Amino acid sequence: MARRQTPPGLPSQRQLRAGEIVRHALAEIISREDFRDPDLSNVIVTVGEVRCSPDLKHANIFVTPLGDDSEEGRKRLADALTRAKGFLRTRLGREIELKFTPELHFIADSSYDEATAIDRLLNDPRVRRDVESEG
């Protein structure tokens, strides 16, 4: 039987599964550890998504601080986690059962702001009126 091919540009099932494993493990590690970095202490981190490369050797981790919606807060968190990535990668290697522990790349996640902006736009009375008149 032929293998099902993933369309170009989309992650494979293997990448998605590895990304979820890394996401769950990192969220647990970050919540459990005590960091000396003042940018990481007393901050609750949301790991929104992890995208793995096709060879699973690199992982882009999208993070946001809970309660700090500013772009500066997200950037500060991503920079702090980047400074701690050696420590986090070592801990991650002990937690997951992958052949290689991926290289971690932390990215400030702005998808929540984008979703809020779209939601606000859809709830605008003028847009709602247009949608209801078409339907």
From Swiss-Prot:
Monomer. Binds 30S ribosomal subunits, but not 50S ribosomal subunits or 70S ribosomes. Its main location: cytoplasm. This is Ribosome-binding factor A. Keywords: Cytoplasm, Ribosome biogenesis. GO terms for biological process: maturation of SSU-rRNA. One of its GO terms (molecular function) is ribosomal small subunit binding. InterPro entries: KH_dom-like_a/b, RbfA, RbfA_dom_sf, Ribosome-bd_factorA_CS. GO terms for cellular component: cytosol. SUPFAM superfamilies: Ribosome-binding factor A, RbfA. It is found in: Cytoplasm. Gene3D superfamilies: 3.30.300.20. Belongs to the RbfA family. PANTHER family: RIBOSOME-BINDING FACTOR A, CHLOROPLASTIC-RELATED (PTHR33515:SF1). One of several proteins that assist in the late maturation steps of the functional core of the 30S ribosomal subunit. Associates with free 30S ribosomal subunits (but not with 30S subunits that are part of 70S ribosomes or polysomes). Required for efficient processing of 16S rRNA. May interact with the 5'-terminal helix region of 16S rRNA. It comes from the Bacteria.
